[in-house]
UniProtKB/Swiss-Prot annotation:
Annotated compartments: Cytoplasm
UniProt xrefs under CDD domains: CysRS_core
Signal peptide start and end residues: none
Cofactor(s) for this UniProt protein: Zn(2+)
Species whose genome carries this gene: Staphylococcus aureus (strain NCTC 8325 / PS 47)
Protein name: Cysteine--tRNA ligase
Gene: cysS
Amino acid sequence: MITLYNTLTRQKEVFKPIEPGKVKMYVCGPTVYNYIHIGNARPAINYDVVRRYFEYQGYNVEYVSNFTDVDDKLIKRSQELNQSVPEIAEKYIAAFHEDVGALNVRKATSNPRVMDHMDDIIQFIKDLVDQGYAYESGGDVYFRTRKFEGYGKLSHQSIDDLKVGARIDAGEHKEDALDFTLWKKAKPGEISWDSPFGEGRPGWHIECSVMAFHELGPTIDIHAGGSDLQFPHHENEIAQSEAHNHAPFANYWMHNGFINIDNEKMSKSLGNFILVHDIIKEVDPDVLRFFMISVHYRSPINYNLELVESARSGLERIRNSYQLIEERAQIATNIENQQTYIDQIDAILNRFETVMNDDFNTANAITAWYDLAKLANKYVLENTTSTEVIDKFKAVYQIFSDVLGVPLKSKNADELLDEDVEKLIEERNEARKNKDFARADEIRDMLKSQNIILEDTPQGVRFKRG
């Protein structure tokens, strides 16, 4: 039984799908005017884990994540680079797939694009105008916010509270300061489309409503995105979707926390804006993913190199323990009376499922993985290995790897760099000083499996490749 925190109700709820055995999930994707930053990577990774866990539990997941390929930022970039909006969008959509692919994010069932749904968007807006929920003014089309009675239910704000900060900017032709744009009148030189309202382009909020409706129907199970999208974007999506469809837009709303850089908000003005395209040249993408899921998705996460290094070390320990299990599989025999270990492995798997069932708590799931690695190390160092137990270890390691999306072997597992070997030797020396001989032996065995031989010399431990 999976429970998740629903932003709409502000409480954990048991997940009940619209269709038995199926999950319809929509995740707000990026505006494709640049490479994605690590703030964009967090929802991509977190909701990929959510999808993977649903699938592990037997659900068929229809996972839709859009590309915003028409937007003010894209138009500005187009003017700066003297390139067309579609050219820029194509470049950064390809870059997005490359970056999230490196982070082991699985491809969505569908990645709808705004430009491909322009006729659908225009018709959706026309329907809202016909129903009295929207109106034309000065070439723009606005949504009548007050007409939708449930406005504010996602962000838990009242119309009166919202009115205090609302204003009508120069050039806008709203009936009410709370109204928001569905269609923008074209400006000279901007990309635009013909419509019953005149030349123009859609507003940001209407795009997601239409693509979600087209791909998944009037009501979806889960709508997800970053906390910054809760208001006004998701609030406006609810208003226009429910006004149009006369049905709940999404039964569950999930929002992930922010990313800070060295305890400061990430921003271009502070010079701490980190692009995934750049950071994965310095940090192993598997480590970056492992770091991202080391904190519960709803909690803020602080990015700094010290914490990333801690994640690298933790993932290395898991992988080293799995390597020992694989090595022992070659010499394992049919030994009986080892049910105690089978039971312990099952208990860890049950704990993993329990914490993942509780709002996808990846932080506690990783703790279970560490415990599995610790038990594996203890087993191979203290026992003649049983085929049954080794196979059980391998199966559960694979489950954890598949659900969390972290491979059990690095992409360059067979190409251990000299600097990595030196770090392992330092760690082994420290372990021996602390009389942690099990860890010291584990490192020695791991290096040996890579044909790296350690030699004691008067100058200290040296290594050579066999």
